Curated annotation (Swiss-Prot):
It comes from the Eukaryota. GO terms for molecular function: alpha-tubulin binding. This is Protein PAC2. It is found in: Cytoplasm, Cytoskeleton. Residues 23-67 form the CAP-Gly domain. GO terms for biological process: microtubule cytoskeleton organization; post-chaperonin tubulin folding pathway; protein folding; tubulin complex assembly. The gene is PAC2. It comes from Saccharomyces cerevisiae (strain ATCC 204508 / S288c). Its main location: cytoplasm. Present with 2140 molecules/cell in log phase SD medium.
Amino acid sequence: MTYEIGDRLKIGGYFCTIKFIGVIKPWPSVKAYGVEWDDHSRGKHSGTIDDIHYFDVQIPNSGSFLKESKIKSPGVRRITFYEALSEKYGGSSNNINDLSIGNKRVEGLGFDELNARNKNYKKLRKIALRDSDVAILFQNQDELNRVIQNCVNVKDLDLSLNLFTNINSLCEFIEPLKNLESLNISQNKLLSGWDNLKEYDLSHIKTLRLSSCGLSYKHIGKLLKSFRTLKMLDLSYNNLTSAGIQNFENEIPCTLEELNISGNNLISFPLFPKNLTLKGLNVSNNQISRAPSIAIYSVESLDITDNKFKERSLIDDLNKTFPSLKNIHLSGNEFNYNGNYINVEEQATFYEVLARFDRVMVLNGSICDVKTRREAEMFFVSKVMNNELSYDTNLPRWSSLIKSYEIDMSKLSFNNERETRQSLVLKIKIRAGKKPSSDLDYWVLPSFTVRYVKSVICRKLNFDILNVKLFHENSEGMINEIKYNFRPISDFNVVNGDIIHVSSPVNNKSIQKVNSPS
């Protein structure tokens, strides 16, 4: 097989791109191939050896030279789509005759075997050829016609992690496959064919996955002219920037319902057309630090995991700009309050974040029922009214909350006087030893079960929940064990300021002393 500059190879399980073919000074008698490795750690230099520069690389020290014997070893393959299809779905045959025309091997099949194989192909609805060394989609029109004939019923095609590079050939290949709806070409380096890319009728494709293809917005803009009725588009981990992606407003199909642009270089949300029907948006693993400037009414699911959101008030901005939001992932952002980092997974913060949104019922993957949401809202309202949480009470969300819980704001003042507070939550002290100096303050709802309170305490103190007992001490110093894991703590007359003693094998003796009669 003859190789050209720009060809992709997989050698020993590692992918690379040929950047140079010729003779180099250290190997004057053999043909050398300069390659750039996808796994940059395998490189040894940047295309320069003995002070002679032979080729350029995108990432410093990601290049190396290989002898032709290494490149043309039996384990290095570049095959056609039809060959890969035959290997995986064609089955074995005892009626194959090996013929040779020049240097090309031709597979000869009996008519019965050929008809049976073609019949099997036509039954296929999904073809999965991920990592199958496919470098050539078709060699000529006859081969393309054979693919069209045999893959007529295919709806889902996975060609991810292969070796083809020409985008024009790819579009020409899939255009006649009119039943094809889902196409995955992720992790292919689409390096060529962009300059003469035609407009194709690829309106039958509804799902397109282009993750990790090294694409810029310039490439995406050209490609979307052919994919005009997409419902799902995955552009994650490419080379998209906020400057380029702002043009999405003019390029993105209005039919799109789900968009994944995670893992790029975005510092802001893209602009979208007003008539967009987008339901799901994933912008995780970017550098975004603020909400969109224009409301996006259609989005119901949003993933902003691992971005640069820092201020708590940005949660309220997201609620305003995504008014239909029902599902949000926002872990990995350094939300803070008074300079302190907030862990969204902590129960109190989880409740607060949930309550700040009008309609969210799934937070960081946790599905919340109506009861949980109501508890979160009660907790949040009480914290705000107790001046324990800074919140803009002029927001429409606050008006909605006080209306929902029939709170007469004219009878309340926001200060620290206990008599003005509404006791929707209880502040208790957790004591795991004899000394009050070790007490931990904890906010609970009266509806929290004993088991839930126990689990939170054990998580904070690193205790084993199976070996822990809780004891309630009221304001008069009376101590009683809290039993019945699935009853609410309100059943045990726990009120503000009470102490919950924790008994575990580590501190069991000290707790027994607390419980001893005087």
